[in-house]
Amino acid sequence: MESRYAHLLSPFQVGNVVFRNRMFTAPMGLHALQGGELYPTEAIITHYANKAKGGAAVVTCSGTGAYPVTPDKDHLAYDLYIGHSQHYLAQLADAIHFYGAKASMEIQAATREAGYYVSGGLMVPGPGMVPGQPTKELTKEMLADIKKNLQDQVKILKRIGYDMCMLHMAYDMGLFGGFLSLRTNKREDEYGPQSLENRLRFLNECCDAIHQAAGKDFLIELRMSGELPEGAGFTIDDACEMAKLVENHADILHVHAATGWQAHCMSFEPDTPNLWMAQKIKESGAKIPVLTIGGYQDLDEMEDAIASGKADLISMARGWLADPNLGTKAYEGRGEDVVPCVKCMRCHDSACIDGIAFVCTVNPLMGIEHEMEKLDKPPKELKKVAVVGGGPAGMQAALTAANRGHHVTLFEEKETLGGQLNFADYAQFKHSLAKYKDYLIYQLSKSPVEVALGVKATREMLVKGNFDAVIVAVGASPLILPIPGAEMAVPAPYVYGNEKELDRSVVVIGGGQVGCETALQLVEQGHDVTVLEMQEKILVDASASYRNRLTRNMGYHENLKTVTGGRCTGITSAGVTYQDAEGNEQLLACGSVVMAAGMRPRRADALALYDPAYRVYTVGDCDKAANVQKAVRAAFAAAISI
């Protein structure tokens, strides 16, 4: 049978190393999966092994520490020099090899936040690299020490089973990137910015040192930006030239975004915003294999990128988190069954910023993969299960329960599935969330779940149906503030698809994620919008990365303004009144008002379904208004408990 993804699944050879297909996994900061151990624990090993099991050709892990050891501002570093750390790192490589993938390790180098601390100063490529911190220029003696340290690391990595390593020089923020950028490299010696050869000299010397220590067959992945921001002196044309300058030193070139905040593309950008840069480098005649990264998960898009010759290889980080079986589904020709990443960045932020439990919005197993053998035991008997509510929590619960063999009926009082996610159909910047909603609906259509649309479930109906268990996922309703004139406001969910019914001038009450997204949707439809937020900052409920990106996109619109520290006191025909931080009464004139003050759990509706005839589980917003990740995780947990 002809493969649907023949090019993506074709083997690829670099030197004497053969990759089974073109799909790599990108390194991520996963240390929130464990405690402060300086070695990978069972949670980390299981996580990476699952990617190999799911079909990845290369699993690139994060990461070993740089020389010299610095204060632990870097959450990514294992200690490669401790014997017991080496044992666990060897187990990690072995687990990856067990499923047929190559094991690669990202070797961490200094960043602006975690550099080389020597004699009380932050040692960097050039003086003044880090604003607000005392810095010293790296001496040639220290550069030699760094090369020696890299050799020591790769010798150990090769000995304990790793096939390759990765060096990071993207975004001009790391050690190697600092040499590349004119903004950070102010040296006056042969490593200075006078030519591209000079700026790459130290990198190439390090690559040569690695190959000298570990051999040519120990491959080097090199991550770089296809271009850097204005002022850095590095364009896509420079990147094409650079590819030729490193091709005899490194083995694979990752082509990434210009900045750290662009590296994690979200729904504000096209799905694969970096492919054009990889294509440019390929077309330049560079001989080094080119890997593209950024936003990949659609198997058809990936197949086209390889088949058209725009790139040789593709790497994904979040794609493998959302669906660790992505590669398996490629081999089975089931691209439509790949779980879409919604690009919310809760994975990155939970691990790298918040330092709490590692999570994924669409993969409820994330963070507990190593526990699933004891958590997800086969049911002792198959039961008749009702799920009430067709939002993300209800659909996840129904699918999970059905996959366990139970007989499942899903009741949804409206004529369509999707619940609170249906708004995403109308907002271009939420297209990833819309894909996830459509994915759940499609999976239900293929499943044995009986879906009853337009049916409001009642306690009497459930008792009469002889259900053994009921999962209640009836969601939440928009919270309406108890203020004069509140009846004049439109709830935020109503706005989507009905934007033309609102006046040109709109005030949105509430500056959380829902309110700010609604405001952005309205300005993109031609409205003039002011967001009124009681707290001193907007978007306090959003993940840090999404908050930064949404704030940035809001800032592009002159007709979108925000007022913070203002407590709404009423709505009149003239507009919205509020009390400012000084206690003065103010008026925001407008023709329409949108209420985005939060959601109220439909707890009474949930409680009305309780009966001793069956066991009840409440999940999602009807238990506590939260986000999609928490709703889906709770739904999954309830379903595997039956």
Give the location of each predicted region.
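Residue-level detector of alpha-helix initiation sites
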Residues: 296, 391-393, 416, 476, ...
